[in-house]
Structures are given as C-alpha cells and as structure tokens.
Amino acid sequence: MIQHMTRLKVADNTGAKEVGVIKVLGGSKKRYASVGDIVVVSVKKATPAGLIAKGQMAKAVIVRTKKSIRRESGLLIRFDENACVLIKEDKTPRGSRIFGPVAREIRDRGYTKIASLAPEVL
C-alpha cells in the first residue's frame, strides 16, 4: 500500500533513483495506491547526468509493491520493494529501459509499453 510520503525506487533509466509520493491520483479522497495506479512524485535522489533532476515533480505508475496482490485465481504475489516507473502525460514511459520484474496487472491496466520493456512480467 503506497500512500502520501512513501519512498519508492525508480525502475527505469531516467536518472531518478528514489522518489517520494506527493499525491495518489484517482477519486476525491483516494488514500492508497497499488500496482497499476498513478501517483504524483517528487525526485529525492538522482544521478547527475540524467533526464530528471532532484526536486523535479513527475507522474509515475506503481509496478512493484511489498503489499501482496491477490489475483482472481487466489494467487498472492508480492515483491521485495516498492518501485515505480516515471511516465509522460500520455501514459508512456519516460525512460527507454525498465529494470526488474513487473506485475501482470500493469498490462491489464493498459500499460503495454511498460510491460513490453520489462525483462519479466509476473
């Protein structure tokens, strides 16, 4: 469960390494984000020669969470970390590579470009 002030790892090559959640988008008082949800983030740590600088704001989609995801088959999936991918306004990834596995719910929510760039879809 991702909420306001949660720190996330960035799983792409935009240059941002860690971000903090400012707002969970969707609904008037939506508190928690799960895999596939969009959040507004602020870059907390970044590499010097990246597309994104420290302090910049961006939108991101959650790709991995420590909180388990329950599927219709009864299967529970959880990851070792909370991670996101920075996206543009048209919901395409800002980076050209994605690191680590992503949940299948990403593809189901319509982020096919992120799912195709990921090395593994669980």
From Swiss-Prot:
- GO cellular-component term (any): cytosolic large ribosomal subunit
CDD domains in the record: Ribosomal_uL14 (cd00337)
- Out of the domains of life, which is the source? Bacteria
Recorded hits in SUPFAM superfamilies, A to Z, give: Ribosomal protein L14
Q: List the disulfide bonds.
A: none
A GO biological process held by the record: translation
What is the protein name given in its UniProt record? Large ribosomal subunit protein uL14
- The organism encoding this protein is Ureaplasma parvum serovar 3 (strain ATCC 700970)
